[in-house]
Amino acid sequence: MAEKNTPSSPLDLFTPTFFQQPHAMLAQLRQSAPALPVTTPNGLRTWLVTRYEEARALLADERLSKDMRVGRHLMSRNFVDPAKQAEFLKETGERSQFPQVLSVHMLYSDPPDHTRLRRLVGRAFTSRRVASLQPRIAALTAELLDGVALHRRTDLMEALAFPVPFTVICWLIGVPPGDRTVFRRWSNLLVSGAGTEEVRQACVDMIGYLRTLIDSKRAAPDDDLLSDLVHTTADGERLTPDELISMACLLLVAGHETTVNLIGNGALALFRHPQVRDQLASDESLWPAAIEEFLRYDGPLTNATWRFTTEPVRVGDVVIPEGELVTISLGAAARDPERHENPDQLDIGRDNSGGIAFGHGIHHCLGAPLARLEGRMVLSQLFTRFPDMRLAVAPDELRWRSSLMMRGLEELPVLTK
């Protein structure tokens, strides 16, 4: 166990109050211990890591596994409530909410499987492909802003932050325009936390759709990422049908949700800091630095995805035992005063090298350049087109999503005039 008495959290985490204002609570946890056990709303015990130095090191630590074949078993052992444990075992059995096919991707794998998957995906998801999307993203954003201009008041999440990343993912996967309405419904259900049976049916429907889509790309390739993934080889290997489906779903959830939140959180930061808006209006070359600061200040992910200790792991003066679930708090680490001076201030001039909003190590997000590109293009066009846009409600009236992983707004009501 720990070198000293095992730390514990006296705070009531994962409540509506926490999701609304997490940073003060996370600061208290960061001061008390580098890692401490907490309990999630579904009764799962996990070790929360809150300091930057330890967080960055653990993101790249090979002693922490992400292989869900191991993870599901370990998760079942880490429930503090037997009733919750029984419910988990039932839900991960024959009636699993998320079929196994959805977890055979590189985010939930370790080397050598991860190495093979990332090499194959990396050959198709190139910097040239990302750069080629710029004119299309610019045109799409301009079209959506034309719609925003028609209304005095609008929800910026629904009108802009959601449709741009969703449409870009549809371009990458090659989802035809006529199928995007139902594809969006499935996507919303997958990330909504809605009733289990409804989500499970959406998974089944999406898997069936993607199998058919992949077959069509195999027979008649298009100029999209999914077609390239179907036909890409490395050392004579290809992605299997299940791996292709899982990768498409990973793009949809990880590649889409994070960008939605980057746009929404970045816009809110600028509404609340007009002096930064003025800086960007007078010097557009500052936008890349601004995006890095948005990722630090209120990034799109509160926590990294689950990891599991394969042996005892020291975190500062605490030792996490083998077989434990570990949650790395990206939000807490990003505001560690040992890393950043005045971390609670928005400062687009600060040095954000070494940022971990998109992870670190072998699991660093392959789609990070695309997310940054979308965030920069959408936000710069938004505030160029609407320099006087402002919040329609007080900041404390905004509602944040109750998510253990995502940090994003439910709505962002604004006034255009």
Task: Briefly describe each language-model feature range.
Residues 1-417:
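Cytochrome P450
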